[in-house]
């Protein structure tokens, strides 16, 4: 049985005070939670501080992006080796905000995926369609293309131990969310698509849902058989709201 993962993407939010306070509150809220893995991805300069604040708890650390290169003259970038060195394990790649604002291509994201795997880190591969693509009935086509960028260059085995986050772009930060049935249909498609290459890997891969996940819709989303947790944005900045989502994932998968 797949173990759910709920991960908080803090995006461009944080301060030393906020990190210490939020992690301290998360430790209290999540004490006793064992049936769901939990990770947080603060801005890079706060990962080490968050790691120390979370020491001794089950909270794992992640990052919001990574560069292709391990070292060299690449101003402003952060390598997989650096993230590994400071204790980040779950690395988000391909987030729609990176695809949109930084023009990151499927091919570039697949290369980042490979670098992370080589370093023993866990890629959290974000995929998902825009509102226009959704309305044009291209959801499955887009998701397949984004997955195939990895499948066709690295094979299905690359997804062993990796995480996929399905985030319909039209639902990120908008307050809109796919219905549980809509989300489940896409998650099943993603799993079935990988299964064409390797059924065992497909059955094991964690597929999160992301896109305005909150305390009120989490339980119904997690009740779906192919939804294995969530990649949470805004709600991850509030310990009580994030904890409700984590506990909903734990309860749904133990039911």
From Swiss-Prot:
**Gene3D superfamilies, sorted:** Aldolase class I
Query: What InterPro entries would the database entry show?
Result: Aldolase_TIM, TIM_sf, TrioseP_Isoase_bac/euk, Triosephosphate_isomerase, Triosephosphate_isomerase_AS
Q: Which reaction does it catalyse?
A: D-glyceraldehyde 3-phosphate = dihydroxyacetone phosphate
Superkingdom field: Bacteria
Q: Does the keyword Endoplasmic reticulum apply?
A: no
Task: Cite the entry's keywords alphabetically.
Answer: Cytoplasm, Gluconeogenesis, Glycolysis, Isomerase
The question of whether Ion transport is a record keyword is answered with no
Q: What is its main location?
A: cytoplasm
Q: What class of enzyme is it?
A: isomerase
Q: In which pathway does it act?
A: Carbohydrate biosynthesis; gluconeogenesis; Carbohydrate degradation; glycolysis; D-glyceraldehyde 3-phosphate from glycerone phosphate: step 1/1
Q: Where in the cell is it found?
A: Cytoplasm
Query: Which GO terms fall under molecular function for this chain's record?
Result: triose-phosphate isomerase activity
Question: What is one process in the GO biological process aspect for this record?
Answer: glyceraldehyde-3-phosphate biosynthetic process
**EC id:** 5.3.1.1
PROSITE patterns recorded for this chain? TIM_1, TIM_2
Q: In the UniProt entry, which residues are flagged as the active site?
A: 95, 167
Residue numbers binding substrate: 9-11, 173, 212, 233-234
- Assembly description: Homodimer.
Q: Which family does it belong to?
A: Belongs to the triosephosphate isomerase family.
Q: Which named protein is this?
A: Triosephosphate isomerase
């Amino acid at each position: 049985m797949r173990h759910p993962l709920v991960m908080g993407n803090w995006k461009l939010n944080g301060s030393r005070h906020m990190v210490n306070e939020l992690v301290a509150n998360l430790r209290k809220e999540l004490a006793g939670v064992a049936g769901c893995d939990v990770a947080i991805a603060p801005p890079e300069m706060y990962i080490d501080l968050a790691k120390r604040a979370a020491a001794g708890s089950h909270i794992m650390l992640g990052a919001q992006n990574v560069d292709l290169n391990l070292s060299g003259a690449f101003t402003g970038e952060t390598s997989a080796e650096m993230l590994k060195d400071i204790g980040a394990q779950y690395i988000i790649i391909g987030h729609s905000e990176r695809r949109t604002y930084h023009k990151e291509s499927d091919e570039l994201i697949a290369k980042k995926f490979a670098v992370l795997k080589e370093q023993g880190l866990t890629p959290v591969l974000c995929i998902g369609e825009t509102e226009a693509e959704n309305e044009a009935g291209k959801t499955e086509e887009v998701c397949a293309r984004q997955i195939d960028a990895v499948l066709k260059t690295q094979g299905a085995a690359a997804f062993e131990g990796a995480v996929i986050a399905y985030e319909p772009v039209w639902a990120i930060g908008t307050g809109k969310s796919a219905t549980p049935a809509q989300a489940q249909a896409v998650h099943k498609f993603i799993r079935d698509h990988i299964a064409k290459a390797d059924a065992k890997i497909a059955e094991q891969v964690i597929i999160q849902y992301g896109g305005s996940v909150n305390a009120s819709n989490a339980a119904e989303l997690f009740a779906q058989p192919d939804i294995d947790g969530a990649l949470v944005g805004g709600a991850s900045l509030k310990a009580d709201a994030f904890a409700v989502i984590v506990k909903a994932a734990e309860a749904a998968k133990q039911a």
